[in-house]
Amino acid sequence: MQVVGVRIEMPSNQPIVLLKEIDGVRFLPIWVGAVEATAIAFAQQGVIPPRPLTHDLMQDIVESLDATLTAVQVTAIEEGVFMASLLIRNSEGNAVSVSARPSDAIALALRTHSNILADSDLLDNVGIEIPEDVAQDALNASGESSEMERFREFLDQINPEDFAG
């Protein structure tokens, strides 16, 4: 998955992180808190704060333990709440899975340049297919267009209840 970006869902002003399949057409919108949305946006934009934020601290802890974050995976949705796991290889080479909120997992993955995965059953159940022309405009950073506006309107119309699973 790739992080398309952080958006604000209207009219609730709730931040969402929008993930997209790398080799597909499905999107996965995940509602997140404002602090986590900021942490994700900072990582996407390469903003380095003067002091470590929580996710920077998490990265430092993993690295200081001679471990590696190999990937993060959005695994499920339960009662409208997304679940995720951090996939870590520890100093002895053992694979360890740690439960996490998707927002924290994504923020950490962006900082460590780790893969972001989504369970295929989850994408089958709650992934959203967006028409190719609209999706391409959303991923194209060259400027505003009517297609981008249509994409934003689509985002404005979806809500967390659509993903109650």
Model-derived regions, located:
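Divalent-cation
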Residues: 1-165
